Amino acid sequence: YSLLLTRLAKLNFSPDTDLLISTGDNIDRGKENLETLRLLNTPWFISVVGNHEAMALDAFETQDGNFWYVNGGYWYDSVTEKDRQEATELLLTFKQRPHIIEVETSSKKYVIAHADYPDDSYDYGKQVDIDSVLWSRDRLLGSLQGNIHPIRGADTFIFGHMIVDYTTTFANQIYIDTDSFCSGNLSFFKIK
């Protein structure tokens, strides 16, 4: 959260005129989980569902948080009851949040998802495997091995999830998760 606000200030981000779209995993990465979740209440911040938000929702639904906790969700039990209630309410909003966001400018179409768009051709509203949208590393791993293919239907796809040393582009896919939690390197892609 603090790192994000510092970087946004350096980028001259204006909450009055700009919009920040997150590729998910807004939790389980540092100590300011609730503060980051509170950004969901601002008009300038939106997010797709990431696999960490999905793990939290699954923990709430099944009453078994072990998988989430070992993947960073332990913070949830370390906050006050009042803060836990607020975090729960904010996390539950991810039931209604999109897994995929499309942004169209006057000249380009961008698609934002957490891990992948699991098809070779994008179409708005097309049914795709949500587990792959949240978890798949196959396309990026294939690209790293030289098996690079564009996804039709949009100009640019922006993904997080799999950590890369620096913002990495293969065909029309951009990977921006530069492990800010450990490296302090928080990456952005400016659409307009």
PLM segments and residue spans:
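N-terminal active-site segment of His-dependent metallophosphoesterases
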Residues: Y1-E35
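A short acidic-Thr-Gly-centered motif at the start of a beta-strand
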Residues: N12-F13, L37-L40, I101-S106, I148-P150, ...
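Active-site neighborhood of divalent metal-dependent phosphoester bond hydrolases
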Residues: D16, N33-V103, S107-K108, V133-S143
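Active-site neighborhood of phospho(di)ester-bond hydrolases with catalytic His/Asp-centered motifs
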Residues: L20-G24, S47-N51, A113, D155-M162, ...
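Short, solvent-exposed loop/turn segments at secondary-structure junctions
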Residues: D28, E53-A54, D116-D120, I163-D165, ...
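Short, well-ordered beta-strand micro-motif
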Residues: E102, I112-H114, F188-K192
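A short secondary-structure junction signal
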Residues: H114-A115, S121-Q127, T169-F170
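Conserved beta-sheet core of the metallophosphoesterase superfamily
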Residues: L134-K192
